[in-house]
Protein backbone atom coordinates (compact mmCIF):
# COMPACT_ATOMS: atom_id res chain seq x y z
CA UNK A 1 0.00 0.00 0.00
CA UNK A 2 1.38 3.46 -0.97
CA UNK A 3 2.00 6.03 1.74
CA UNK A 4 0.00 9.20 2.18
CA UNK A 5 2.78 11.40 0.76
CA UNK A 6 3.00 9.24 -2.36
CA UNK A 7 -0.75 9.51 -2.89
CA UNK A 8 -0.65 13.31 -2.65
CA UNK A 9 2.23 13.51 -5.12
CA UNK A 10 0.39 11.20 -7.54
CA UNK A 11 -2.77 13.28 -7.20
CA UNK A 12 -0.91 16.47 -8.22
CA UNK A 13 0.50 14.74 -11.27
CA UNK A 14 -2.89 13.36 -12.33
CA UNK A 15 -4.42 16.84 -12.39
CA UNK A 16 -2.27 17.68 -15.44
CA UNK A 17 -3.07 14.53 -17.49
CA UNK A 18 -6.23 13.92 -19.62
CA UNK A 19 -9.37 12.45 -18.12
CA UNK A 20 -8.88 9.04 -19.73
CA UNK A 21 -5.43 8.66 -18.18
CA UNK A 22 -6.75 9.62 -14.77
CA UNK A 23 -9.52 7.03 -15.10
CA UNK A 24 -7.04 4.31 -15.93
CA UNK A 25 -4.81 5.26 -13.02
CA UNK A 26 -7.79 5.16 -10.66
CA UNK A 27 -8.79 1.70 -11.85
CA UNK A 28 -5.26 0.44 -11.40
CA UNK A 29 -5.07 1.88 -7.91
CA UNK A 30 -8.43 0.32 -7.00
CA UNK A 31 -7.31 -3.12 -8.19
CA UNK A 32 -4.24 -2.86 -5.99
CA UNK A 33 -6.40 -1.95 -3.02
CA UNK A 34 -8.71 -4.94 -3.53
CA UNK A 35 -5.77 -7.28 -3.85
CA UNK A 36 -4.24 -5.98 -0.66
CA UNK A 37 -7.57 -6.32 1.11
CA UNK A 38 -7.99 -9.96 0.04
CA UNK A 39 -4.49 -10.72 1.24
CA UNK A 40 -5.23 -9.05 4.53
CA UNK A 41 -8.40 -11.12 5.06
CA UNK A 42 -6.56 -14.34 4.27
CA UNK A 43 -3.79 -13.52 6.72
CA UNK A 44 -6.36 -12.69 9.34
CA UNK A 45 -8.08 -16.03 8.81
CA UNK A 46 -4.80 -17.91 9.17
CA UNK A 47 -4.04 -16.13 12.42
CA UNK A 48 -7.45 -17.08 13.76
CA UNK A 49 -6.98 -20.71 12.87
CA UNK A 50 -3.57 -20.82 14.50
CA UNK A 51 -5.04 -19.36 17.58
CA UNK A 52 -7.84 -21.96 17.57
CA UNK A 53 -5.34 -24.77 17.17
CA UNK A 54 -3.40 -23.54 20.13
CA UNK A 55 -6.55 -23.44 22.18
CA UNK A 56 -7.55 -26.96 21.06
CA UNK A 57 -4.24 -28.35 22.20
CA UNK A 58 -5.02 -26.97 25.58
CA UNK A 59 -7.55 -29.79 26.14
CA UNK A 60 -10.77 -28.22 24.86
CA UNK A 61 -12.91 -30.53 22.67
CA UNK A 62 -14.28 -29.63 19.23
CA UNK A 63 -17.99 -29.10 19.05
CA UNK A 64 -18.40 -29.08 15.23
CA UNK A 65 -16.58 -31.40 12.88
CA UNK A 66 -16.75 -31.94 9.10
CA UNK A 67 -15.97 -34.91 6.95
CA UNK A 68 -12.59 -34.97 5.31
CA UNK A 69 -14.13 -34.82 1.84
CA UNK A 70 -16.03 -31.64 2.72
CA UNK A 71 -12.97 -30.01 4.25
CA UNK A 72 -10.73 -30.90 1.32
CA UNK A 73 -13.20 -29.65 -1.26
CA UNK A 74 -13.79 -26.45 0.69
CA UNK A 75 -10.07 -25.77 0.88
CA UNK A 76 -9.66 -26.46 -2.83
CA UNK A 77 -12.58 -24.16 -3.63
CA UNK A 78 -10.88 -21.34 -1.68
CA UNK A 79 -7.56 -22.02 -3.47
CA UNK A 80 -5.91 -22.60 -0.10
CA UNK A 81 -2.84 -24.61 -1.13
CA UNK A 82 -1.43 -24.63 2.38
CA UNK A 83 -4.52 -26.19 3.91
CA UNK A 84 -4.79 -28.73 1.07
CA UNK A 85 -1.20 -29.69 1.73
CA UNK A 86 -2.02 -30.05 5.40
CA UNK A 87 -4.90 -32.46 4.64
CA UNK A 88 -2.79 -34.50 2.26
CA UNK A 89 -0.01 -34.85 4.83
CA UNK A 90 -2.58 -36.12 7.29
CA UNK A 91 -3.43 -39.04 5.02
CA UNK A 92 -6.64 -37.58 3.58
CA UNK A 93 -7.41 -39.19 0.21
CA UNK A 94 -7.18 -36.74 -2.71
CA UNK A 95 -9.95 -38.66 -4.53
CA UNK A 96 -12.70 -37.87 -2.02
CA UNK A 97 -15.81 -36.55 -3.75
CA UNK A 98 -19.17 -35.00 -2.91
CA UNK A 99 -22.66 -36.31 -3.71
CA UNK A 100 -22.26 -35.33 -7.39
CA UNK A 101 -19.04 -37.31 -7.76
CA UNK A 102 -16.99 -34.12 -8.00
CA UNK A 103 -13.42 -34.40 -6.67
CA UNK A 104 -10.99 -31.68 -5.63
CA UNK A 105 -9.15 -32.18 -8.91
CA UNK A 106 -12.36 -31.53 -10.87
CA UNK A 107 -12.96 -28.32 -8.93
CA UNK A 108 -9.43 -27.02 -9.42
CA UNK A 109 -9.57 -27.75 -13.17
CA UNK A 110 -12.77 -25.73 -13.40
CA UNK A 111 -11.35 -22.77 -11.42
CA UNK A 112 -7.87 -22.96 -13.01
CA UNK A 113 -5.97 -23.45 -9.72
CA UNK A 114 -2.74 -24.75 -11.20
CA UNK A 115 -0.79 -24.98 -7.93
CA UNK A 116 -3.35 -27.18 -6.21
CA UNK A 117 -3.73 -29.33 -9.35
CA UNK A 118 -0.01 -30.11 -9.25
CA UNK A 119 -0.22 -30.71 -5.52
CA UNK A 120 -3.10 -33.18 -5.85
CA UNK A 121 -1.47 -35.06 -8.73
CA UNK A 122 1.82 -35.29 -6.87
CA UNK A 123 0.00 -36.95 -3.97
CA UNK A 124 -1.54 -39.61 -6.21
CA UNK A 125 -4.89 -38.13 -7.24
CA UNK A 126 -6.69 -40.09 -9.96
CA UNK A 127 -6.21 -38.10 -13.16
CA UNK A 128 -9.15 -39.93 -14.82
CA UNK A 129 -11.63 -39.67 -11.94
CA UNK A 130 -15.25 -39.46 -13.16
CA UNK A 131 -18.23 -37.73 -11.64
CA UNK A 132 -21.86 -38.84 -11.91
CA UNK A 133 -22.01 -37.73 -15.57
CA UNK A 134 -18.69 -39.42 -16.40
CA UNK A 135 -16.80 -36.15 -16.75
CA UNK A 136 -13.05 -36.37 -16.13
CA UNK A 137 -10.80 -33.47 -15.05
CA UNK A 138 -9.62 -33.29 -18.67
CA UNK A 139 -13.22 -32.73 -19.80
CA UNK A 140 -13.48 -29.82 -17.37
CA UNK A 141 -10.16 -28.25 -18.38
CA UNK A 142 -10.87 -28.64 -22.11
CA UNK A 143 -14.35 -27.16 -21.78
CA UNK A 144 -13.04 -24.12 -19.89
CA UNK A 145 -10.10 -23.70 -22.28
CA UNK A 146 -7.36 -23.93 -19.63
CA UNK A 147 -4.47 -24.90 -21.88
CA UNK A 148 -1.92 -25.01 -19.03
CA UNK A 149 -4.00 -27.53 -17.08
CA UNK A 150 -4.59 -29.63 -20.21
CA UNK A 151 -0.84 -29.99 -20.69
CA UNK A 152 -0.34 -30.98 -17.04
CA UNK A 153 -3.16 -33.56 -17.11
CA UNK A 154 -1.87 -35.12 -20.34
CA UNK A 155 1.62 -35.38 -18.82
CA UNK A 156 0.13 -37.31 -15.89
CA UNK A 157 -1.64 -39.73 -18.27
CA UNK A 158 -5.12 -38.28 -18.76
CA UNK A 159 -7.31 -40.35 -21.10
CA UNK A 160 -7.85 -38.40 -24.31
CA UNK A 161 -10.63 -40.80 -25.40
CA UNK A 162 -12.68 -40.66 -22.20
CA UNK A 163 -16.39 -40.53 -23.05
CA UNK A 164 -18.93 -38.83 -20.80
CA UNK A 165 -22.62 -39.67 -20.47
CA UNK A 166 -23.44 -37.54 -23.52
CA UNK A 167 -20.96 -39.48 -25.64
CA UNK A 168 -18.52 -36.58 -25.87
CA UNK A 169 -14.75 -36.69 -25.60
CA UNK A 170 -12.59 -33.80 -24.35
CA UNK A 171 -11.83 -32.60 -27.87
CA UNK A 172 -15.58 -32.56 -28.63
CA UNK A 173 -16.19 -30.05 -25.84
CA UNK A 174 -13.20 -27.79 -26.45
CA UNK A 175 -14.02 -24.49 -28.19
CA UNK A 176 -10.71 -22.71 -27.58
CA UNK A 177 -8.56 -23.09 -30.69
CA UNK A 178 -5.10 -23.18 -29.01
CA UNK A 179 -6.33 -25.71 -26.45
CA UNK A 180 -7.91 -27.81 -29.18
CA UNK A 181 -4.64 -27.79 -31.12
CA UNK A 182 -2.82 -29.13 -28.07
CA UNK A 183 -5.36 -31.92 -27.59
CA UNK A 184 -5.33 -32.94 -31.26
CA UNK A 185 -1.52 -32.89 -31.31
CA UNK A 186 -1.41 -35.20 -28.32
CA UNK A 187 -3.96 -37.52 -29.95
CA UNK A 188 -1.89 -37.68 -33.13
CA UNK A 189 1.26 -38.35 -31.10
CA UNK A 190 -0.48 -41.28 -29.37
CA UNK A 191 -1.56 -42.72 -32.74
CA UNK A 192 -5.29 -42.32 -32.17
CA UNK A 193 -7.33 -42.88 -35.37
CA UNK A 194 -10.97 -42.28 -36.23
CA UNK A 195 -11.70 -46.00 -36.05
CA UNK A 196 -10.44 -46.10 -32.49
CA UNK A 197 -12.51 -43.05 -31.61
CA UNK A 198 -15.67 -44.68 -32.99
CA UNK A 199 -14.87 -47.89 -31.13
CA UNK A 200 -14.51 -46.03 -27.85
CA UNK A 201 -17.77 -44.16 -28.39
CA UNK A 202 -19.65 -47.42 -28.97
CA UNK A 203 -17.97 -49.30 -26.12
CA UNK A 204 -20.63 -48.59 -23.42
CA UNK A 205 -23.49 -49.58 -25.70
CA UNK A 206 -21.62 -52.67 -26.88
CA UNK A 207 -21.07 -53.73 -23.27
CA UNK A 208 -24.78 -53.34 -22.56
CA UNK A 209 -25.67 -55.39 -25.65
CA UNK A 210 -23.36 -58.19 -24.54
CA UNK A 211 -24.97 -58.14 -21.08
CA UNK A 212 -28.44 -58.36 -22.67
CA UNK A 213 -27.36 -61.37 -24.73
CA UNK A 214 -26.10 -63.04 -21.57
CA UNK A 215 -29.45 -62.43 -19.88
CA UNK A 216 -31.31 -63.85 -22.87
CA UNK A 217 -29.12 -66.94 -22.90
CA UNK A 218 -29.70 -67.42 -19.17
CA UNK A 219 -33.46 -66.97 -19.57
CA UNK A 220 -33.63 -63.95 -17.29
CA UNK A 221 -36.41 -61.38 -17.37
CA UNK A 222 -35.52 -58.40 -19.56
CA UNK A 223 -38.07 -56.26 -17.70
CA UNK A 224 -35.88 -56.41 -14.59
CA UNK A 225 -35.96 -53.19 -12.56
CA UNK A 226 -33.31 -51.64 -10.33
CA UNK A 227 -33.65 -49.90 -6.99
CA UNK A 228 -35.23 -46.83 -8.60
CA UNK A 229 -37.72 -48.80 -10.67
CA UNK A 230 -35.83 -48.24 -13.92
CA UNK A 231 -35.63 -51.00 -16.53
CA UNK A 232 -33.00 -51.73 -19.13
CA UNK A 233 -35.13 -49.84 -21.66
CA UNK A 234 -35.07 -46.78 -19.38
CA UNK A 235 -31.27 -46.91 -19.36
CA UNK A 236 -31.03 -47.40 -23.13
CA UNK A 237 -33.53 -44.59 -23.71
CA UNK A 238 -31.71 -42.12 -21.47
CA UNK A 239 -28.32 -42.86 -23.06
CA UNK A 240 -29.56 -43.15 -26.64
CA UNK A 241 -28.43 -46.75 -27.14
CA UNK A 242 -30.47 -47.50 -30.27
CA UNK A 243 -29.11 -50.98 -30.95
CA UNK A 244 -29.61 -52.06 -27.36
CA UNK A 245 -33.15 -50.67 -27.39
CA UNK A 246 -33.96 -52.47 -30.65
CA UNK A 247 -32.68 -55.72 -29.17
CA UNK A 248 -34.87 -55.28 -26.11
CA UNK A 249 -37.94 -54.37 -28.17
CA UNK A 250 -37.42 -57.35 -30.47
CA UNK A 251 -37.62 -59.61 -27.41
CA UNK A 252 -40.93 -58.16 -26.27
CA UNK A 253 -39.88 -55.67 -23.62
CA UNK A 254 -42.75 -53.40 -22.55
CA UNK A 255 -42.51 -49.72 -23.46
CA UNK A 256 -45.02 -48.51 -20.86
CA UNK A 257 -43.18 -49.59 -17.69
CA UNK A 258 -42.86 -46.73 -15.19
CA UNK A 259 -40.20 -46.17 -12.55
CA UNK A 260 -40.85 -44.87 -9.03
CA UNK A 261 -41.32 -41.32 -10.39
CA UNK A 262 -43.80 -42.44 -13.04
CA UNK A 263 -41.33 -42.04 -15.89
CA UNK A 264 -41.58 -44.27 -18.93
CA UNK A 265 -38.61 -44.85 -21.27
CA UNK A 266 -40.01 -42.17 -23.59
CA UNK A 267 -39.87 -39.62 -20.76
CA UNK A 268 -36.20 -40.46 -20.20
CA UNK A 269 -35.42 -40.13 -23.91
CA UNK A 270 -37.23 -36.79 -24.07
CA UNK A 271 -35.51 -35.40 -20.96
CA UNK A 272 -32.02 -36.27 -22.19
CA UNK A 273 -32.69 -35.15 -25.77
CA UNK A 274 -32.44 -38.53 -27.48
CA UNK A 275 -34.46 -37.77 -30.63
CA UNK A 276 -33.84 -41.01 -32.59
CA UNK A 277 -34.65 -43.02 -29.48
CA UNK A 278 -37.95 -41.17 -29.08
CA UNK A 279 -38.92 -41.98 -32.67
CA UNK A 280 -38.05 -45.65 -32.10
CA UNK A 281 -40.13 -45.87 -28.93
CA UNK A 282 -43.12 -44.14 -30.52
CA UNK A 283 -42.96 -46.49 -33.49
CA UNK A 284 -43.21 -49.41 -31.04
CA UNK A 285 -46.29 -48.04 -29.32
CA UNK A 286 -44.97 -45.67 -26.66
CA UNK A 287 -47.63 -43.16 -25.66
CA UNK A 288 -46.90 -39.47 -26.22
CA UNK A 289 -49.68 -38.62 -23.76
CA UNK A 290 -48.29 -40.65 -20.85
CA UNK A 291 -47.91 -38.61 -17.67
CA UNK A 292 -45.47 -38.88 -14.79
CA UNK A 293 -46.24 -38.60 -11.10
CA UNK A 294 -45.83 -34.83 -11.53
CA UNK A 295 -48.40 -34.83 -14.38
CA UNK A 296 -45.73 -34.24 -17.04
CA UNK A 297 -45.86 -35.53 -20.59
CA UNK A 298 -42.71 -36.26 -22.65
CA UNK A 299 -43.03 -32.95 -24.48
CA UNK A 300 -43.04 -31.10 -21.14
CA UNK A 301 -39.63 -32.56 -20.29
CA UNK A 302 -37.94 -31.36 -23.50
CA UNK A 303 -35.53 -28.46 -23.29
CA UNK A 304 -34.71 -28.11 -26.99
CA UNK A 305 -37.28 -26.50 -29.28
CA UNK A 306 -36.27 -28.77 -32.16
CA UNK A 307 -37.08 -31.82 -30.06
CA UNK A 308 -40.44 -30.34 -29.06
CA UNK A 309 -41.33 -29.80 -32.71
CA UNK A 310 -40.40 -33.42 -33.46
CA UNK A 311 -42.61 -34.74 -30.66
CA UNK A 312 -45.50 -32.55 -31.84
CA UNK A 313 -45.13 -33.95 -35.36
CA UNK A 314 -45.05 -37.51 -34.01
CA UNK A 315 -48.16 -36.83 -31.93
CA UNK A 316 -49.96 -35.32 -34.94
CA UNK A 317 -49.09 -38.30 -37.15
CA UNK A 318 -50.22 -40.71 -34.45
CA UNK A 319 -53.57 -38.88 -34.09
CA UNK A 320 -54.12 -38.92 -37.85
CA UNK A 321 -53.44 -42.66 -38.03
CA UNK A 322 -55.82 -43.36 -35.16
CA UNK A 323 -58.57 -41.23 -36.72
CA UNK A 324 -58.15 -42.95 -40.07
CA UNK A 325 -58.38 -46.36 -38.42
CA UNK A 326 -61.53 -45.36 -36.55
CA UNK A 327 -63.02 -43.93 -39.74
CA UNK A 328 -62.22 -47.13 -41.60
CA UNK A 329 -63.89 -49.25 -38.92
CA UNK A 330 -66.98 -47.03 -38.80
CA UNK A 331 -67.31 -47.03 -42.59
CA UNK A 332 -67.17 -50.81 -42.67
CA UNK A 333 -69.86 -51.13 -40.02
CA UNK A 334 -72.01 -48.52 -41.75
CA UNK A 335 -71.82 -50.33 -45.06
CA UNK A 336 -72.77 -53.58 -43.37
CA UNK A 337 -75.75 -52.10 -41.56
CA UNK A 338 -77.10 -50.12 -44.52
CA UNK A 339 -76.58 -52.68 -47.22
CA UNK A 340 -80.27 -52.49 -48.24
CA UNK A 341 -80.45 -48.70 -48.44
CA UNK A 342 -79.94 -46.96 -51.75
CA UNK A 343 -77.60 -44.03 -52.09
CA UNK A 344 -77.14 -43.33 -48.37
CA UNK A 345 -73.38 -43.69 -48.45
CA UNK A 346 -71.75 -41.67 -51.22
CA UNK A 347 -68.08 -42.26 -51.72
CA UNK A 348 -66.15 -39.65 -53.60
CA UNK A 349 -62.55 -39.92 -54.62
CA UNK A 350 -60.39 -36.97 -53.79
CA UNK A 351 -59.48 -34.48 -56.47
CA UNK A 352 -55.89 -35.66 -56.57
CA UNK A 353 -56.95 -39.30 -56.99
CA UNK A 354 -59.25 -38.44 -59.85
CA UNK A 355 -56.63 -36.28 -61.51
CA UNK A 356 -54.06 -39.07 -61.29
CA UNK A 357 -56.61 -41.55 -62.66
CA UNK A 358 -57.42 -39.35 -65.64
CA UNK A 359 -53.74 -38.75 -66.30
CA UNK A 360 -53.01 -42.47 -66.33
CA UNK A 361 -55.94 -43.09 -68.67
CA UNK A 362 -54.81 -40.39 -71.07
CA UNK A 363 -51.22 -41.61 -71.08
CA UNK A 364 -52.33 -45.17 -71.76
CA UNK A 365 -54.70 -43.94 -74.43
CA UNK A 366 -51.97 -41.99 -76.20
CA UNK A 367 -49.67 -45.03 -76.21
CA UNK A 368 -52.51 -47.21 -77.49
CA UNK A 369 -53.28 -44.85 -80.33
CA UNK A 370 -49.64 -44.62 -81.37
CA UNK A 371 -49.50 -48.38 -81.68
CA UNK A 372 -52.93 -48.78 -83.22
CA UNK A 373 -52.56 -46.00 -85.80
CA UNK A 374 -49.49 -47.67 -87.30
CA UNK A 375 -51.22 -51.06 -87.40
CA UNK A 376 -54.42 -49.66 -88.91
CA UNK A 377 -52.57 -47.73 -91.61
CA UNK A 378 -50.90 -50.94 -92.72
CA UNK A 379 -54.15 -52.88 -92.52
CA UNK A 380 -56.08 -50.22 -94.44
CA UNK A 381 -53.60 -50.20 -97.31
CA UNK A 382 -53.83 -54.01 -97.48
CA UNK A 383 -57.54 -54.53 -97.80
CA UNK A 384 -58.61 -51.17 -99.27
CA UNK A 385 -58.36 -52.65 -102.75
CA UNK A 386 -60.32 -55.71 -101.66
CA UNK A 387 -63.20 -53.48 -100.57
CA UNK A 388 -63.53 -51.87 -103.99
CA UNK A 389 -63.28 -55.22 -105.76
CA UNK A 390 -65.89 -56.80 -103.52
CA UNK A 391 -68.35 -53.95 -103.98
CA UNK A 392 -67.89 -53.99 -107.77
CA UNK A 393 -68.54 -57.73 -107.95
CA UNK A 394 -71.60 -57.42 -105.73
CA UNK A 395 -73.09 -54.61 -107.81
CA UNK A 396 -72.60 -56.61 -111.03
CA UNK A 397 -74.05 -59.81 -109.62
CA UNK A 398 -76.94 -58.57 -107.47
CA UNK A 399 -78.78 -55.29 -107.97
CA UNK A 400 -80.46 -55.76 -104.57
CA UNK A 401 -77.86 -55.31 -101.80
CA UNK A 402 -78.01 -57.80 -98.97
CA UNK A 403 -76.01 -59.27 -96.15
CA UNK A 404 -73.79 -62.22 -96.94
CA UNK A 405 -75.61 -64.09 -94.16
CA UNK A 406 -79.39 -63.54 -94.58
CA UNK A 407 -80.81 -61.97 -91.44
CA UNK A 408 -84.27 -60.61 -90.83
CA UNK A 409 -84.37 -56.84 -90.67
CA UNK A 410 -86.26 -56.95 -87.40
CA UNK A 411 -83.62 -59.25 -85.88
CA UNK A 412 -80.89 -57.03 -87.26
CA UNK A 413 -82.45 -53.94 -85.73
CA UNK A 414 -82.98 -55.77 -82.45
CA UNK A 415 -79.33 -56.82 -82.30
CA UNK A 416 -78.20 -53.29 -83.01
CA UNK A 417 -80.48 -51.85 -80.34
CA UNK A 418 -79.18 -54.40 -77.84
CA UNK A 419 -75.59 -53.63 -78.76
CA UNK A 420 -74.88 -57.14 -80.04
CA UNK A 421 -73.40 -55.93 -83.33
CA UNK A 422 -70.44 -53.87 -82.27
CA UNK A 423 -67.59 -52.73 -84.41
CA UNK A 424 -64.03 -52.36 -83.19
CA UNK A 425 -63.71 -50.29 -80.05
CA UNK A 426 -61.56 -47.20 -80.57
CA UNK A 427 -60.77 -44.56 -77.99
CA UNK A 428 -63.31 -46.08 -75.61
CA UNK A 429 -66.19 -45.64 -78.15
CA UNK A 430 -68.07 -48.19 -80.21
CA UNK A 431 -67.56 -48.09 -83.97
CA UNK A 432 -70.78 -47.59 -85.96
CA UNK A 433 -72.46 -50.31 -87.95
CA UNK A 434 -71.73 -49.43 -91.58
CA UNK A 435 -72.30 -50.84 -94.96
CA UNK A 436 -68.69 -51.83 -95.41
CA UNK A 437 -66.22 -54.30 -94.06
CA UNK A 438 -64.48 -53.77 -90.72
CA UNK A 439 -61.56 -55.31 -88.93
CA UNK A 440 -62.77 -56.95 -85.73
CA UNK A 441 -60.82 -57.18 -82.49
CA UNK A 442 -59.72 -60.76 -83.21
CA UNK A 443 -58.32 -59.86 -86.64
CA UNK A 444 -61.26 -61.17 -88.73
CA UNK A 445 -63.02 -59.06 -91.35
CA UNK A 446 -66.78 -58.66 -91.17
CA UNK A 447 -68.26 -57.96 -94.62
CA UNK A 448 -71.64 -56.40 -95.17
CA UNK A 449 -73.39 -55.05 -98.29
CA UNK A 450 -75.45 -51.93 -98.50
CA UNK A 451 -78.97 -52.11 -97.16
CA UNK A 452 -81.92 -50.72 -99.09
CA UNK A 453 -83.29 -47.38 -97.98
CA UNK A 454 -86.11 -48.48 -95.71
CA UNK A 455 -86.48 -45.03 -94.20
CA UNK A 456 -88.54 -43.78 -97.16
CA UNK A 457 -90.79 -46.81 -97.05
CA UNK A 458 -91.66 -46.37 -93.38
CA UNK A 459 -92.56 -42.70 -93.30
CA UNK A 460 -89.33 -40.86 -92.56
CA UNK A 461 -88.86 -38.70 -95.65
CA UNK A 462 -86.50 -36.29 -93.91
CA UNK A 463 -83.91 -38.86 -92.90
CA UNK A 464 -82.43 -39.42 -96.33
CA UNK A 465 -81.69 -35.71 -96.80
CA UNK A 466 -79.56 -35.47 -93.65
CA UNK A 467 -75.92 -34.94 -94.62
CA UNK A 468 -73.47 -37.58 -93.48
CA UNK A 469 -72.15 -36.75 -90.01
CA UNK A 470 -68.57 -37.32 -91.12
CA UNK A 471 -68.74 -35.37 -94.37
CA UNK A 472 -66.51 -32.57 -93.12
CA UNK A 473 -64.24 -34.74 -91.03
CA UNK A 474 -62.21 -36.19 -93.90
CA UNK A 475 -60.48 -32.95 -94.76
CA UNK A 476 -59.61 -32.11 -91.16
CA UNK A 477 -56.15 -32.49 -89.73
CA UNK A 478 -55.53 -35.45 -87.38
CA UNK A 479 -57.07 -34.97 -83.99
CA UNK A 480 -54.87 -34.10 -81.04
CA UNK A 481 -54.93 -35.85 -77.68
CA UNK A 482 -56.78 -32.89 -76.16
CA UNK A 483 -59.55 -33.20 -78.76
CA UNK A 484 -59.80 -36.93 -78.12
CA UNK A 485 -60.15 -36.22 -74.39
CA UNK A 486 -62.91 -33.69 -74.94
CA UNK A 487 -64.79 -35.89 -77.37
CA UNK A 488 -64.51 -38.90 -75.12
CA UNK A 489 -65.65 -36.99 -72.04
CA UNK A 490 -68.63 -35.57 -73.92
CA UNK A 491 -69.59 -38.99 -75.24
CA UNK A 492 -69.45 -40.51 -71.75
CA UNK A 493 -71.67 -37.78 -70.34
CA UNK A 494 -74.41 -38.46 -72.87
CA UNK A 495 -76.72 -41.17 -71.64
CA UNK A 496 -79.51 -41.09 -74.25
CA UNK A 497 -80.84 -44.38 -75.70
CA UNK A 498 -79.72 -45.60 -79.06
CA UNK A 499 -81.82 -44.32 -81.95
CA UNK A 500 -82.28 -47.01 -84.51
CA UNK A 501 -82.92 -44.58 -87.34
CA UNK A 502 -79.23 -43.60 -87.35
CA UNK A 503 -78.52 -46.94 -88.92
CA UNK A 504 -80.66 -46.09 -91.88
CA UNK A 505 -79.10 -42.70 -92.26
CA UNK A 506 -75.63 -44.16 -92.04
CA UNK A 507 -76.20 -46.91 -94.58
CA UNK A 508 -78.57 -45.23 -97.06
CA UNK A 509 -75.98 -43.63 -99.25
CA UNK A 510 -74.97 -43.88 -102.91
CA UNK A 511 -71.87 -45.68 -104.01
CA UNK A 512 -69.92 -42.47 -104.42
CA UNK A 513 -70.84 -40.97 -101.05
CA UNK A 514 -70.25 -44.33 -99.41
CA UNK A 515 -66.77 -44.62 -100.81
CA UNK A 516 -66.00 -41.13 -99.56
CA UNK A 517 -67.22 -41.97 -96.05
CA UNK A 518 -65.31 -45.21 -95.77
CA UNK A 519 -61.94 -43.73 -95.15
CA UNK A 520 -62.91 -41.77 -92.07
CA UNK A 521 -64.82 -44.75 -90.67
CA UNK A 522 -62.06 -47.26 -91.21
CA UNK A 523 -59.02 -45.14 -90.53
CA UNK A 524 -60.51 -42.59 -88.15
CA UNK A 525 -59.56 -42.51 -84.54
CA UNK A 526 -63.01 -42.05 -83.03
CA UNK A 527 -66.53 -43.15 -83.77
CA UNK A 528 -69.67 -41.02 -84.05
CA UNK A 529 -71.26 -43.40 -81.52
CA UNK A 530 -70.49 -43.42 -77.84
CA UNK A 531 -70.06 -46.50 -75.73
CA UNK A 532 -73.75 -46.49 -74.76
CA UNK A 533 -74.93 -46.32 -78.37
CA UNK A 534 -75.63 -42.60 -78.61
CA UNK A 535 -74.88 -40.89 -81.91
CA UNK A 536 -72.74 -37.81 -81.56
CA UNK A 537 -72.43 -35.34 -84.44
CA UNK A 538 -69.29 -33.25 -84.61
CA UNK A 539 -68.98 -29.84 -86.22
CA UNK A 540 -66.23 -29.00 -88.69
CA UNK A 541 -64.29 -27.16 -86.00
CA UNK A 542 -62.56 -29.79 -83.91
CA UNK A 543 -62.59 -27.65 -80.80
CA UNK A 544 -66.41 -27.27 -80.71
CA UNK A 545 -68.29 -29.51 -78.30
CA UNK A 546 -70.19 -32.49 -79.76
CA UNK A 547 -73.86 -31.98 -80.55
CA UNK A 548 -76.55 -34.58 -80.07
CA UNK A 549 -79.06 -34.78 -82.89
CA UNK A 550 -82.35 -36.59 -82.32
CA UNK A 551 -84.51 -38.18 -84.99
CA UNK A 552 -87.99 -39.58 -84.95
CA UNK A 553 -88.07 -43.23 -83.97
CA UNK A 554 -88.59 -45.69 -86.75
CA UNK A 555 -91.87 -47.54 -86.69
CA UNK A 556 -91.68 -51.17 -85.77
CA UNK A 557 -91.37 -53.29 -88.89
CA UNK A 558 -93.52 -56.30 -89.48
CA UNK A 559 -91.90 -59.62 -90.15
CA UNK A 560 -94.27 -60.42 -92.99
CA UNK A 561 -92.92 -57.60 -95.15
CA UNK A 562 -89.46 -59.08 -95.50
CA UNK A 563 -88.89 -62.81 -95.50
CA UNK A 564 -85.73 -64.58 -94.81
CA UNK A 565 -85.63 -66.14 -98.28
CA UNK A 566 -85.84 -64.69 -101.77
CA UNK A 567 -86.00 -66.04 -105.33
CA UNK A 568 -82.89 -65.29 -107.31
Curated annotation (Swiss-Prot):
Protein name in the entry: Protein phosphatase 1 regulatory inhibitor subunit 16B
Native species: Mus musculus
Removed propeptide positions: 566-568
Signal peptide range in chain numbering: none
GO CC annotation, single: nuclear speck
Record-level Gene Ontology MF annotations: protein phosphatase regulator activity
Example GO biological process: establishment of endothelial barrier
Lipidated positions per record (S-farnesyl cysteine): 565
Amino acid sequence: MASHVDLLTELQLLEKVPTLERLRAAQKRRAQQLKKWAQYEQDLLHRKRKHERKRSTGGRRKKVSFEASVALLEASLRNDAEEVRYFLKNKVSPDLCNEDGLTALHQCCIDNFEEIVKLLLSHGANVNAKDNELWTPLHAAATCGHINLVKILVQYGADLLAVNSDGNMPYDLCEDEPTLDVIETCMAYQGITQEKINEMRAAPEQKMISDIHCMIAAGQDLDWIDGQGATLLHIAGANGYLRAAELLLDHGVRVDVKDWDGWEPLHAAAFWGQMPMAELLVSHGASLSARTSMDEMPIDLCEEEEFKVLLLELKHKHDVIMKSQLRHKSSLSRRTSSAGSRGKVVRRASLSDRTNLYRKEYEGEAILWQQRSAAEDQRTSTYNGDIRETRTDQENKDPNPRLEKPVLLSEFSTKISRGELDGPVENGLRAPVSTYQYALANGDIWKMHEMPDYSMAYGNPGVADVPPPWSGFKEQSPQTLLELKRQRAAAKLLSHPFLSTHLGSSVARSGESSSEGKAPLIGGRTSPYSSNGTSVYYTVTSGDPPLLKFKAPMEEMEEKVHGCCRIS
